[in-house]
Amino acid sequence: MSDISQQMNNLSVQDNNKPNGNGYSGQPQQQSGRRQYVPPHLRNRSSHQPSSNGANGDIPFGGSRRSDYGGGRGGFGFGGGSNGGGSGPSGGYRNGGARGGSRGGFGGGRYQRPTPGVGRWVDGKHEPAPRNDRLELELFGVAEDTLFQSSGINFDNYDDIPVEASGEGVPEPINSFTAPPLDELLVENIKLSRFTKPTPVQKYSVPIVAAGRDLMACAQTGSGKTGGFLFPVLSESYMNGPAPIPESTGAFSSHKVYPTILVMAPTRELVSQIYDESKKFAYRSWVRPCVVYGGADIGNQIRQLDRGCDLLVATPGRLKDLLERGRVSLANIKYLVLDEADRMLDMGFEPQIRHIVQECDMPDVQDRQTLMFSATFPRDIQMLARDFLKDYIFLSVGRVGSTSENITQKVLYVEDEEKKSVILDLLNANSEGLTIVFTETKRMADNLADFLYDQGFPATAIHGDRSQYEREKALAAFKSGQAPILVATAVAARGLDIPNVSHVINYDLPSDIDDYVHRIGRTGRAGNVGIATAFFNRNNKNIVKGMLDLLTEANQEVPDFLNKIARESAFGRPGRGSSRGGGAGGFGGSRGGANRDFRRAGGASGSSSSGWGNSSSSGWGGSGNSGWGNSNGYSNGGGSYGGSRSSFNDNSSYGNPSSQNSWW
């Protein structure tokens, strides 16, 4: 980190012509003379061959030229690759077992050849499939391949993160991945993934789910939340098997799937990532993962579902569509997972989620286990839990809503007209590794990516107006290092876990401090170190108080201009900090109490760790069942958050979440 700090200290916003070790400079270059960035996992190979699917050194990145950039991922494609967003059949998760007694062939008693890597549930016992070297290479890579890395050099630091679990009868945490309590097959897959020890959220989630309890987990971004729900629900599924098909539907129906596990998340990138992880941990088991999301051909997704689906990862809009078409039944759901739950509500998905959970054929809250995971859980989201969870355990890991000390944060005062000059200096000074640049609008993302390309920097862009094919190509090119600079809107700000991201630049700062936290969380993940640089000016003074709190909490340097603007804002516009919970210090001193269990003391903060105050099992300090929608921090937001957060839909890449044509 000393070298990085030295580079930052030597940074000049005036010198645009400074060359670096990779030959980049502020002046335009011929692309043919540019040295291509080679990611760490490819550096020891004899040659770095680009993708054969259209991504090579001759294909440019900028503007319409960038639309041809990158290549589709073969094998286990990102979100299905060329299969249009389905759970691509090349992965070996085609048919597996069936919905009959022995799960030996799907639909109508047809005989189908066993699929490599897919086990069976026969006569009440789990029969794992034989190991398959080809699938293991595709799923887990090789030991030195950091594209599949699972831990960083500071991973042991997580042992010092404080954990607070509230609720009655909290089980003791685990300290290692062992069988028991985990299923033996899952432990083998975890070892293949090179996970050496559980993160704090995983230490608690495994015994909590094994005890049959519901869970609300609030943990730092990059702290292993995906494994926190996949590990326990898959382990329990391997040991207990699938539920029988409801008799009223016919045991051999080939037109509807009956998943055991449902995972809902807000964006297609996040569900695709969860699906990729689920394939690793479901390897050789009877559980067949599938993924569905908007923006891809629904016909292809239906065909993938018809081949069998036991774990369904979905965005709310596409799942609602498939339910209405009669292609998915939720009657057999044992485990419901809501990932990034706060963001799903922020984006207006509450009506769709309530319809799926409460109005379809999903088992009642008493007959399923529900897990809610996110980086933040403000009070309005916790209040929603009264309808979705029962007797749950609230888990708060670390300083929830704050940032990791593994991330070195730098805040630079940059006027809007100087931003392009400064970003060239930044990229010249820190040319190694992958860089994500965040903008507030789709137009700016394209404009900046074109500008960087014209200046000799291999950049690509993703946002909501890009087709799914273009987005998959851009992400694949970025992860492979062929385009080591990714310009993105908020579509990539949450949940995506891309290894080797060493630098995050907030070219445009968001209006919500929580969004800033999630953006910079794309680096410094799983114990690795990273740099986050923010371009700040007086147009961003609405979040200055929140930024001061974050920098102080993470022991980061606070520039003098930030303190000065904060004092000015305090006189001119008192009380404007974070847009949630009334700014910093609202409840429990963590921006609205995002890491507090509001069941304590009838919904008030600051209570002791023992007892539940005056709140009942279903009450929230006297709040009625319908009161939460208008009592949250989004005035006029109601259920869709449209009144006070209209700028979110205007400037983000999510589009209109209520539209049937949206990409969810």
Curated annotation (Swiss-Prot):
<feature type="region of interest" description="Disordered">
    <location>
        <begin position="1"/>
        <end position="129"/>
    </location>
</feature>
<dbReference type="InterPro" id="IPR000629">
    <property type="entry name" value="RNA-helicase_DEAD-box_CS"/>
</dbReference>
<keyword id="KW-0547">Nucleotide-binding</keyword>
<dbReference type="GO" id="GO:0051880">
    <property type="term" value="F:G-quadruplex DNA binding"/>
</dbReference>
<dbReference type="InterPro" id="IPR014014">
    <property type="entry name" value="RNA_helicase_DEAD_Q_motif"/>
</dbReference>
<feature type="compositionally biased region" description="Polar residues">
    <location>
        <begin position="648"/>
        <end position="664"/>
    </location>
</feature>
<dbReference type="InterPro" id="IPR011545">
    <property type="entry name" value="DEAD/DEAH_box_helicase_dom"/>
</dbReference>
<feature type="domain" description="Helicase C-terminal">
    <location>
        <begin position="406"/>
        <end position="566"/>
    </location>
</feature>
<dbReference type="InterPro" id="IPR027417">
    <property type="entry name" value="P-loop_NTPase"/>
</dbReference>
<keyword id="KW-0378">Hydrolase</keyword>
<protein>
    <recommendedName>
        <fullName>ATP-dependent RNA helicase DED1</fullName>
        <ecNumber>3.6.4.13</ecNumber>
    </recommendedName>
</protein>
<dbReference type="InterPro" id="IPR001650">
    <property type="entry name" value="Helicase_C-like"/>
</dbReference>
<feature type="compositionally biased region" description="Polar residues">
    <location>
        <begin position="1"/>
        <end position="18"/>
    </location>
</feature>
<feature type="compositionally biased region" description="Gly residues">
    <location>
        <begin position="574"/>
        <end position="592"/>
    </location>
</feature>
<dbReference type="GO" id="GO:0016887">
    <property type="term" value="F:ATP hydrolysis activity"/>
</dbReference>
<feature type="short sequence motif" description="Q motif">
    <location>
        <begin position="175"/>
        <end position="203"/>
    </location>
</feature>
<dbReference type="Pfam" id="PF00271">
    <property type="entry name" value="Helicase_C"/>
</dbReference>
<dbReference type="GO" id="GO:0031047">
    <property type="term" value="P:regulatory ncRNA-mediated gene silencing"/>
</dbReference>
<feature type="compositionally biased region" description="Low complexity">
    <location>
        <begin position="19"/>
        <end position="37"/>
    </location>
</feature>
<dbReference type="GO" id="GO:0010494">
    <property type="term" value="C:cytoplasmic stress granule"/>
</dbReference>
<dbReference type="Pfam" id="PF00270">
    <property type="entry name" value="DEAD"/>
</dbReference>
<comment type="similarity">
    <text>Belongs to the DEAD box helicase family. DDX3/DED1 subfamily.</text>
</comment>
<dbReference type="GO" id="GO:0002151">
    <property type="term" value="F:G-quadruplex RNA binding"/>
</dbReference>
<dbReference type="InterPro" id="IPR014001">
    <property type="entry name" value="Helicase_ATP-bd"/>
</dbReference>
<feature type="short sequence motif" description="DEAD box">
    <location>
        <begin position="339"/>
        <end position="342"/>
    </location>
</feature>
<dbReference type="GO" id="GO:1990625">
    <property type="term" value="P:negative regulation of cytoplasmic translational initiation in response to stress"/>
</dbReference>
<feature type="domain" description="Helicase ATP-binding">
    <location>
        <begin position="206"/>
        <end position="395"/>
    </location>
</feature>
<dbReference type="GO" id="GO:0000390">
    <property type="term" value="P:spliceosomal complex disassembly"/>
</dbReference>
<dbReference type="GO" id="GO:0003743">
    <property type="term" value="F:translation initiation factor activity"/>
</dbReference>
<dbReference type="GO" id="GO:0031370">
    <property type="term" value="F:eukaryotic initiation factor 4G binding"/>
</dbReference>
<keyword id="KW-0963">Cytoplasm</keyword>
<dbReference type="GO" id="GO:0005681">
    <property type="term" value="C:spliceosomal complex"/>
</dbReference>
<keyword id="KW-0067">ATP-binding</keyword>
<keyword id="KW-0347">Helicase</keyword>
<dbReference type="GO" id="GO:0003729">
    <property type="term" value="F:mRNA binding"/>
</dbReference>
<feature type="compositionally biased region" description="Low complexity">
    <location>
        <begin position="606"/>
        <end position="618"/>
    </location>
</feature>
<dbReference type="GO" id="GO:0033592">
    <property type="term" value="F:RNA strand annealing activity"/>
</dbReference>
<dbReference type="GO" id="GO:1901195">
    <property type="term" value="P:positive regulation of formation of translation preinitiation complex"/>
</dbReference>
<feature type="compositionally biased region" description="Gly residues">
    <location>
        <begin position="69"/>
        <end position="110"/>
    </location>
</feature>
<keyword id="KW-0648">Protein biosynthesis</keyword>
<dbReference type="GO" id="GO:0002183">
    <property type="term" value="P:cytoplasmic translational initiation"/>
</dbReference>
<comment type="function">
    <text>ATP-binding RNA helicase involved in translation initiation. Remodels RNA in response to ADP and ATP concentrations by facilitating disruption, but also formation of RNA duplexes.</text>
</comment>
